[in-house]
């Protein structure tokens, strides 16, 4: 028989999703295996994988291997001793983005604290290769803090992504428990320096709720992000990946997420996605700047013309 606490924390109905396994989804999954590529969508058990892969033509590639040197207590990605870098990975990612005809791609990476450059050179090369083969696809990067190595950050930002995403994850008080190898202030500095290096590139961060934070702490985190020129915020429900991970302390209702979004917009964020199933890459194609949106428009027009030509033939 469930305890009172377990009954309170049982997953609510609004966290149930309808799976969409259309051709886009199944084709992408097959290609990932054939190309020996990894996606955070799968590794981190993202609840939106069917919507993004099946409907929005977006995907999040995870590079620099599938094993992370850190062991954050909320994350489902494998941890341990990573493999050697795969120098052919940038080309394979770029080719896959082209074959899938993605509108928006997010390139994230495991933390590579074992590498002198934190993997920044291969990361930047991946962005460049994707851009070369896919000029109409917008590119978002989601790196770790690279151990606070700002030369590595400069290398990465020089590749000119369309969005720099670096997640604060939780409020200041909970950071040591949630992600012991990172620090709250280093995350803020990473975001600030990213904006200083490339002022025209939107910066973005994500916050999980349900770990025991208060509303006041959430608002303080919003203020800290805005004070460091962060443009975009996503807020989503923390879901426990396994019994080894941190427990969910609270399930926020859709109404509460709506209120958090309003507060964020009132505080000056240019864009905020907030909801039970929102993750840092959720609807990311809508968050790019005007230049990237124009590339989207041209790409969609080109795709429409190609489909029309094929139909006529």
Curated annotation (Swiss-Prot):
EC number: 2.8.1.8
Catalyzed reaction equations: [[Fe-S] cluster scaffold protein carrying a second [4Fe-4S](2+) cluster] + N(6)-octanoyl-L-lysyl-[protein] + 2 oxidized [2Fe-2S]-[ferredoxin] + 2 S-adenosyl-L-methionine + 4 H(+) = [[Fe-S] cluster scaffold protein] + N(6)-[(R)-dihydrolipoyl]-L-lysyl-[protein] + 4 Fe(3+) + 2 hydrogen sulfide + 2 5'-deoxyadenosine + 2 L-methionine + 2 reduced [2Fe-2S]-[ferredoxin]
A molecular-function term among this protein's GO annotations: lipoate synthase activity
UniProt keyword annotation of Disulfide bond present: no
Main location: cytoplasm
Annotated binding of [4Fe-4S] cluster 1, by residue: 41, 46, 52, 281
GO cellular component: cytoplasm
Enzyme type, top EC level: transferase
Record note on cofactor: Binds 2 [4Fe-4S] clusters per subunit. One cluster is coordinated with 3 cysteines and an exchangeable S-adenosyl-L-methionine.
Keywords: 4Fe-4S, Cytoplasm, Iron, Iron-sulfur, Metal-binding, S-adenosyl-L-methionine, Transferase
Short name of any one Pfam family annotated for the protein: LIAS_N
Keyword Transferase carried by entry: yes
Entries under CDD domains matching the protein: Radical_SAM
Record domain Radical SAM core: where: 54-270
Names of the cofactor(s): [4Fe-4S] cluster
Positions contributing to [4Fe-4S] cluster 2 binding: 68, 72, 75
Protein location: Cytoplasm
Family affiliation: Belongs to the radical SAM superfamily. Lipoyl synthase family.
NCBIfam families, sorted: lipA (TIGR00510), PRK05481.1 (NF004019), PRK12928.1 (NF009544)
Name the record gives this protein: Lipoyl synthase
Species name: Staphylococcus saprophyticus subsp. saprophyticus (strain ATCC 15305 / DSM 20229 / NCIMB 8711 / NCTC 7292 / S-41)
């Amino acid at each position: 028989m469930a305890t009172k606490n377990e009954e309170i924390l049982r997953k609510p109905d609004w966290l149930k999703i309808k799976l969409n396994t259309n051709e886009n989804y199944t084709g992408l999954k097959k290609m990932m295996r054939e190309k020996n590529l990894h996606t955070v969508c799968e590794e981190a058990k993202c609840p939106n994988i069917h919507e993004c892969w099946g409907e929005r033509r977006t995907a999040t590639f995870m590079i620099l291997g599938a094993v992370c040197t850190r062991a954050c207590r909320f994350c489902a990605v494998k941890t341990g001793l990573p493999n050697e870098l795969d120098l052919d990975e940038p080309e394979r990612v770029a080719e896959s983005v082209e074959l899938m005809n993605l509108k928006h791609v997010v390139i994230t990476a495991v933390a590579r604290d074992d590498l002198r450059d934190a993997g920044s050179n291969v990361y930047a090369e991946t962005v460049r290769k994707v851009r070369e083969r896919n000029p109409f696809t917008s590119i978002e990067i989601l790196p770790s803090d690279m151990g606070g190595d700002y030369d590595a950050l400069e290398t990465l930002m020089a590749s000119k992504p369309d969005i720099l995403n670096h997640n604060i994850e939780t409020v200041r008080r909970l950071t040591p428990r949630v992600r012991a190898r990172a620090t709250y202030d280093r995350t803020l500095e990473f975001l600030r320096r990213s904006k200083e290096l490339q002022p025209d590139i939107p910066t973005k961060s994500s916050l999980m709720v349900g770990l025991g934070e208060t509303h006041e702490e959430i608002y303080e985190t919003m203020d800290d992000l805005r004070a460091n020129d962060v443009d975009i915020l996503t807020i989503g429900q923390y879901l426990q990946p396994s019994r080894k991970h941190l427990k969910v302390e609270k399930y926020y209702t859709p109404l509460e997420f709506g209120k958090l979004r309003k507060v964020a917009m009132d505080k000056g964020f240019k864009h905020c996605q907030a909801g039970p199933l929102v993750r840092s890459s959720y609807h990311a194609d809508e968050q790019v700047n005007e230049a990237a949106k124009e590339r989207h428009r041209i790409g969609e027009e080109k795709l429409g013309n190609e489909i029309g030509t094929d139909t006529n033939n």
